[in-house]
């Protein structure tokens, strides 16, 4: 259904709380994975986000995604389609240990069927 051509993880250890993500760490990770995989940031059309639905974490994550792959830093032009972002957690809730594989399955099926799954608000 799809090929995973790159992945990565990081942890910078510097944020005001254990559950608060770091914009800098997320932005660096998104950029590094593209570079390591030989994919231009402008070629990213969809991001399956962590998207836990927190008031602090989601804005930080979406800002990093927008800066890494979107128009805000000139990665895309004004006439280019936007980067689509979603998270399976809006459909299923947080699966804790299984949430990563559920995200991969959802994204694989979306690519295979060429259809976007709507996010439940």
Regions found by a protein language model. Name each.
Residues 1-121:
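Condensing-enzyme catalytic core of the thiolase-fold
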């Amino acid at each position: 259904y799809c090929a995973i051509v790159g992945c990565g993880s990081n942890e910078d250890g510097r944020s005001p709380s254990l559950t608060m993500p770091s914009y800098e760490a997320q932005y660096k990770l998104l950029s590094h994975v593209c570079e390591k995989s030989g994919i231009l940031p402008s070629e990213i059309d969809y991001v399956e986000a962590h998207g836990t639905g927190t008031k602090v974490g989601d804005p930080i994550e979406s800002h990093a995604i927008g800066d890494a792959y979107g128009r805000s830093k000139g990665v895309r032009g004004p006439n280019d389609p936007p980067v689509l972002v979603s998270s399976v957690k809006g459909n299923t809730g947080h699966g804790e240990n299984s949430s990563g594989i559920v995200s991969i399955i959802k994204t694989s099926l979306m690519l295979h069927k060429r259809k976007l799954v709507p996010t439940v608000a």
